[in-house]
Design a protein with these regions (language model features):
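Phosphate-handling active-site elements
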Residues: 98-100, 120-135, 159-161, 216-226, ...
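A structural signal for isolated positions on well-ordered beta-strands in alpha/beta enzyme cores
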Residues: 48, 73, 134-136, 301
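Acidic/histidine-rich catalytic neighborhood of metal-dependent amide-processing enzymes
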Residues: 110-184, 395-396
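Metal-dependent amide/peptide-bond hydrolase catalytic core
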Residues: 53, 186-396
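N-terminal helical capping/dimerization or prosegment-like subdomains
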Residues: 2-85, 257-261, 278
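Acidic-glycine-rich active-site phosphate/pyrophosphate-binding loop
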Residues: 83-98, 162, 177-189
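Active-site metal-coordination/substrate-binding segment of hydrolases
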Residues: 71-134
Length: 396
């Protein structure tokens, strides 16, 4: 990072810089992290980094205000989804302003929020008193909330953890009290190859995979029809779907291998472990015995691809009321997408989700955020500072 070049100071200018870093989850985010680290250092703020095992990606954490005191954490992820194959009308990594909007990959999800936080740093430094503000920016949220786990593990070793966390995912600045959790699995079915004229001598991996997929489909229908239901969510029940299948080499060859990926998006109150146990029990007790009657070497293997918990809003009533007061929106919402909030909540750090922009613009070509949304988030930061700077500030 060239620290001889003046850093931008406005939200829009900072966002332009953040967008210029291609932080697709498959790439390193270190250039962006080093830029944030240098930006904070220029303002006298010390950062700490936690890296992935390869040292190619990092989270950044910083505290503005007194050390060793629990404060409000402002959290977001630095990675973005790919642009490959999407029909963008301009360079996705160059911020373009048009019709009261700024376009670029990550504008809504969620570098707009990070830009608002960074633009507010000088004001935070001037105004914070007894209660600090913490900044937490992670890597690889888009591929299963991977990076934040290392950040939280580091926080768990500290004498004091944050009082609460605001996750800045796009909610149009409404306060979201909860969201569903998710688990994604890859299932590998290993059969026995052979000539298709002699099907009785082989074990058709695709057909047995279909038995498992049908079981998942039936379970999904049961959840839809019998619940449990929570009308705060859309849809109001936990869902199961198979999203990818591959297997076989030719129509006249008994397929030796088939693999498929499925996911469960579950209500925060649902027991997802029990759901997974049902599927694995069906594989173990019904599918594998049929396969192994022909060849004992056949079998079914489950591999978890990604997982994050739902956000229940446990212990967050004070935080919810406080943030609703800051936004001016008294009606809280729930989210159909996931965030890192449930992982903070699992550490007994109350969490809500509130940030600028709309999830409807995320992951799409010509992703954008309205300038009015950035202005609302800027105002939120100032109001947050005013509130926490008051003597004796408490959330409850």
């Amino acid at each position: 990072v060239n620290t001889s070049v003046p850093f931008p100071s406005t939200t829009r200018a900072i966002l332009a810089q953040l967008i210029a870093f291609d932080t697709t989850s498959s790439r390193s985010n270190l250039d962006l992290i080093r830029w944030i680290e240098a930006y904070l250092a220029q303002h006298g703020v010390t950062s700490s980094l936690t890296f992935n095992a390869e040292g190619t990606k990092a989270n950044v954490y910083a505290t503005i205000g007194p050390a060793g005191v629990a404060g409000i954490c402002l959290s977001g992820h630095t990675d973005v989804v790919p642009t490959t194959g999407q029909p963008w009308t301009a360079d996705p990594y160059t911020l373009v302003e048009r019709d009261g909007k700024v376009f670029g990959r990550g504008t809504a999800d969620m570098k707009g929020f990070i830009a608002c936080v960074l633009a507010a740093v000088p004001a935070f430094l001037a105004g914070v008193r007894e209660v600090p503000l913490h900044l937490a920016f992670s890597y690889d949220e888009e591929v299963g909330c991977v990076g934040v786990r290392g950040l939280l593990a580091a926080l768990a070793k500290e004498p004091v953890k944050p009082l609460a966390v605001i996750i800045g995912e796009p909610t149009l600045m409404h306060v979201a009290r909860g969201h569903k959790g998710k688990q994604a699995y890859r299932v590998v079915v290993e059969g026995r190859a052979g000539h298709s004229a002699l099907t009785h001598l082989g074990v058709n991996a695709i057909e047995y995979a279909c038995d498992l997929i049908s079981f998942l489909r039936n379970k999904a229908n049961t959840l839809r029809d019998e619940g449990p239901h929570d009308e705060a969510y859309e849809p109001a029940y936990s869902t199961i779907q198979t999203g990818k299948v591959s297997g076989g080499i030719a129509v006249n060859v008994i397929p030796e291998r088939c693999e498929f990926d499925f996911e469960i998006r579950h209500l925060p109150s649902d027991d997802v472990v029990a759901m997974i146990d049902e599927v694995s029990a069906f594989a173990r007790e019904t599918v594998e015995p049929q396969m192994r009657a022909v060849d004992p070497a056949c079998g079914v293997h489950f591999q978890r691809i990604s997982a994050y918990p739902g956000l229940l809003g446990r212990g967050a009533h004070g935080l919810q009321r406080f943030c609703c007061g800051l936004t001016g929106f008294q009606d809280m919402i729930t989210l159909s997408f996931g965030t890192e909030g449930g992982l903070f909540e699992a550490m007994d750090i109350p969490a809500i989700v509130c940030g600028p922009g709309s999830i409807e613009q995320a992951h799409r070509p010509d992703e954008f955020i309205e300038l009015d949304q950035l202005a609302r988030c800027d105002a939120f930061m100032q109001d947050l500072l005013t509130a926490v700077a008051k003597p004796g500030f408490k959330l409850d």
